[in-house]
Amino acid sequence: MDNLRPVLYLSMLLVLFLIWQAWNRDYGPQPVAAPGAQEQVMDRDGVPAPPQDVPDAPVSEAVDAPTEVAPAEPDRRRIRVVTDVLDIEIDTRGGDLVRADLPTYPVSLRTPDQPIRLLDERFRQYVAQSGLIHDRVPGVSGEGRAPSHHAIFQAERDEFRLADGQDELRVPLTWTSEDGVQVTKTYTFRRGDFLINVDHAVRNNSDQPWVGRQYRQIRHGSTPSRESWFLYTFTGVAYHDGRYEKLSLEDMAGKPLDKDVQGGWISIIQHYFLTAWVPFEHEINQFYTRVLGTPARPEHIIGMRSEAQTAAPGEETVFTSRFWVGPKEQAALKAIQPGLELTVDYGMLSFLAKPLFWVLDWIHNVVGNWGWAIIILTILIKLVFYKLSETSYRSMAKMRAVQPKMMQLKDRYGDDKQRMNQALMELYKKEKINPLGGCLPILVQIPVFIALYWVLLESVEMRQAPWILWIQDLSVRDPYFILPILMGVTMIAQYKLNPAPMDPIQQKLMMALPFVFTVFFAFFPAGLVLYWFVNNLLSIAQQWYITRNIEKAGKKG
């Protein structure tokens, strides 16, 4: 056991380092990509070719790529939409969502008036696009009959606000072709909701049939990535086609997506937040991915294209869809579409992290504070493993009691390690001691620790959640390092309660570990340090009680 305990602690230290590296990657300064202009592709006659970022039709069904010529840029406007939970900008070019702020989610507690920004057109960073493409009908030219996200729409005013007492806000944008096809693109916002309805109503006022499809896509301009060795929060493309699938931005070029899916959804995931196009469950769409730009400045697109719909002359057809732009709230996401809640990704220990979050959430609903919920969860975990810990601490207490006999064996056999180990095994057998028993608490804590790390890292409910006094955000480090220092003190106390290793080098190593752990924990989220600190306090109390009883029994005997 003397050799195994330091190895376990060093393994734990390695896990801490990997977690710390991942945490630093997520909360360190983010690099900013330089803006890059989209290259315009010319055909042989020097005329601009159709835009590359508009999806093509299936090969089996010919489709005219949109070739409408956008009016002069002065006709392009920004429409602002403000609800109680969203502050949106819509570009009249394409009717795209080019900015999305979440006023109820500030960037940090120090800047409460600066909201999190998800969609952001600057540097081509993050834009939600949608439009229509026209199928070729024999004898009918599709040119200019369907507005892509390059077309210029008209809006009745420049700002829409959800008024007090109003539950729904509709923002209509209109486009009309030269032959009389009128398209009304309508965004519908609801109070307290991050889900936006997006409809394209096609009114065919021409004398020719209209046949076309709707496409929806999210465009993401990559910034230089910073990978960690082991644990990280996934940022990239995710979709659901009956199964939850992830595709990193780096892999999109080599693994393009192209499949027909009923229902499902497509998304780009960020830490704590999500943007996703969510069709209705009965719809069949073709999911696709594209990578544009240059290797140095790639632009990633994930999208979906609907089946064709027809509007005869004088008739109307409507394309519907939904777009989520907001936090990864598991209950809300699960209610929208099956599998959407899986974007809250707890990593390789999801089977353990999910029940931990469920219990934490239940406790929080009772006590109303995430800090106290973590403390109560720690107590419950300790109760679950009480008997296992009791067995381990009894073994360690017995080891401590026979320490003098072990020192006598060391003096007797000196450097003869073979005879020394044989004598120790006989002593353990005689005293009914399991030399590996003291390692069990460490082994039990490691997976729980990692799972709780994922819960704190991925659950937006924990973001900026206060506890008491100076701890106003359990998802970031203690600003004054008080909890890490207290945690280090508890580790020193635990070291004093445990039997000291016989090897002097191992003794020095075990004495140094509390200080090393304190340094690592100083940069971990306060909620995680709180869990470890309370767990150590409970372990010390349990170990002290068991050790005292065994020592009393030894004196009586």
UniProtKB/Swiss-Prot annotation:
Full protein name: Membrane protein insertase YidC
Molecular functions (GO terms): membrane insertase activity
Record bears the keyword Protein biosynthesis: no
NCBIfam families named in the record: PRK01318.1-3, PRK01318.1-4, yidC_nterm, yidC_oxa1_cterm
InterPro entries per UniProt: Membr_insert_YidC, Membr_insert_YidC_N, YidC/ALB3/OXA1/COX18, YidC/Oxa/ALB_C, YidC_ALB_C, YidC_periplasmic_sf
Organism: Thioalkalivibrio sulfidiphilus (strain HL-EbGR7)
Superkingdom to which the source organism belongs: Bacteria
Family the entry assigns: Belongs to the OXA1/ALB3/YidC family. Type 1 subfamily.
Listed GO biological process terms: protein insertion into membrane; protein transport
Keyword Iron-sulfur part of the UniProt annotation: no
Subunit structure: Interacts with the Sec translocase complex via SecD. Specifically interacts with transmembrane segments of nascent integral membrane proteins during membrane integration.
UniProt membrane topology term: Multi-pass membrane protein
Region (Disordered): 34-60
UniProt lineage: Bacteria, Pseudomonadati, Pseudomonadota, Gammaproteobacteria, Chromatiales
A single Gene Ontology CC term: plasma membrane
Primary role: Required for the insertion and/or proper folding and/or complex formation of integral membrane proteins into the membrane. Involved in integration of membrane proteins that insert both dependently and independently of the Sec translocase complex, as well as at least some lipoproteins. Aids folding of multispanning membrane proteins.
Name of encoding gene: yidC
